[in-house]
Amino acid sequence: MKSVSELLYHWLGESPVPYMEGWELQRQLHKRRVADQVPDTVLLLEHEPVYTAGKRTGPWDRPLTDPGAPVIDIDRGGKITWHGPGQLTAYPIVKLPAPLDVVAYVRMLEEAIIRVIGDFGLSGMRVEGRTGVWLAAAPDRGLPERKIAAIGCRIAKGVTMHGFALNCNNDLSWFDRIVPCGIRDAGVTSLTAELDRTVGVGDILEATEHHLAAVLGASSYRRIAGWPVLPEFVDA
């Protein structure tokens, strides 16, 4: 997959973003990227607590009782997961070269996350048949394989949406109310839980920007704080 152009990061700030507002911003950026009105862009943010159900979510994956946060059906792949404070969510809105290779793109996101957590001393890995980034089982500590980052994407008209979520210092009990990503035989973890010290979203922003730009082959990258100012959409 050849290089993308300059990658523009928008850090939406420390206040958690309601999911529907973030999703609408993705859609507005997506149609402008398809029309070449904006550059390749990545939204970096934290969400208010929310469960998002991808297209493969079954009724058995959903909360059986009131989970304490909205459950929203969305147009990405995958099953159900949680987003909320203490979790870095990244939404690349990037034009991929033809022919599209969705698997290669997902592997790039996984590689970026593996490099990010590697900077903090953790050895991330892939698990065959499962997306996301994992930590190996630790039988001596009584720990199964643990998922530290979830990935779910949508590609339409050659441009990506949705992306990945990396657990930093979020409350992991939110995942107890669902079958996260449809996987029953593994755990969920965070940087803070693994390192036994607080690692917040702000602590991993620079590493995330650097490694994601590198795996996407961006010629350069820069960060803008705040929500993007969108040009008026012109439908070609």
Curated annotation (Swiss-Prot):
Lineage top rank: taxon: Bacteria
Site residues by UniProt (Lowers pKa of active site Cys): K147
Pathway membership: Protein modification; protein lipoylation via endogenous pathway; protein N(6)-(lipoyl)lysine from octanoyl-[acyl-carrier-protein]: step 1/2
GO terms under biological process: protein modification process
Protein name: Octanoyltransferase
Positions of the BPL/LPL catalytic domain: 36-220
Record field: catalytic activity: octanoyl-[ACP] + L-lysyl-[protein] = N(6)-octanoyl-L-lysyl-[protein] + holo-[ACP] + H(+)
GO molecular function, one term: lipoyl(octanoyl) transferase activity
Pfam families (alphabetical): LplA-B_cat
Enzyme Commission code: 2.3.1.181
Highest classification ranks of the organism: Bacteria, Bacillati, Actinomycetota, Actinomycetes, Streptosporangiales
Binding positions for substrate per the UniProt entry: R76, G77, G78, K79, I80, T81, W82, H83, A150, I151, G152, G163, F164, A165
Compartments reported by the entry: Cytoplasm
Keyword annotations: Acyltransferase, Cytoplasm, Transferase
Organism: Thermobifida fusca (strain YX)
Database matches in SUPFAM superfamilies: Class II aaRS and biotin synthetases
Miscellaneous information on this protein: In the reaction, the free carboxyl group of octanoic acid is attached via an amide linkage to the epsilon-amino group of a specific lysine residue of lipoyl domains of lipoate-dependent enzymes.
Family named by the database record: Belongs to the LipB family.
Active site annotation, chain numbering: C181 (acyl-thioester intermediate)
InterPro entries cross-referenced by the UniProt entry: aa-tRNA-synth_II/BPL/LPL, BPL_LPL_catalytic, Octanoyltransferase, Octanoyltransferase_CS
